[in-house]
From Swiss-Prot:
GO terms for cellular component: cytoplasm. NCBIfam families: PRK00668.1. SUPFAM superfamilies: Nucleoside diphosphate kinase, NDK (SSF54919). The keyword Metal-binding applies. It catalyses: a 2'-deoxyribonucleoside 5'-diphosphate + ATP = a 2'-deoxyribonucleoside 5'-triphosphate + ADP; a ribonucleoside 5'-diphosphate + ATP = a ribonucleoside 5'-triphosphate + ADP. The lineage of its organism: Bacteria, Pseudomonadati, Pseudomonadota, Alphaproteobacteria, Hyphomicrobiales. CDD domains: NDPk_I. One of its GO terms (biological process) is GTP biosynthetic process. SMART domains: NDK. GO terms for molecular function: ATP binding; metal ion binding; nucleoside diphosphate kinase activity. This is Nucleoside diphosphate kinase. It is found in: Cytoplasm.
Amino acid sequence: MAIERTFSILKPDATARNLTGAINALIEKAGLRIVAQKRIRMTREQAETFYAVHKARPFFGELVDFMISGPVVVQVLEGEGAILKYRDIMGATDPSKAADGTIRKLHAKSVGENSVHGSDATETAAVEIAQFFSGNEIVG
């Protein structure tokens, strides 16, 4: 399996509960390296652009409001099969359906406040990484 990069966001519900270290430990335990990380407060424009794929969905406004409600931690993760590996350790979007030991089973509050985001494909990972990081911020 190839070394690849994926994008991660630790959402406001996770940062509000100081879970960055606990989530990072799960990421690293799974064999992924955190090659870039920063804590930011997303602007409304950033959140609307990031979640533009959901613009027509009824939850779009609520999602954007949630993502700008507090700090987030944006990350670039690297490793063999990083995209699928991170999606596996995140767990199902609905924490009640997430497997034991996954980030969402351990830390998510609800479907809406599900602690983390991870890219779903190579192409989306590249776009999402570029939205928040310049090349010199990624130290692989």
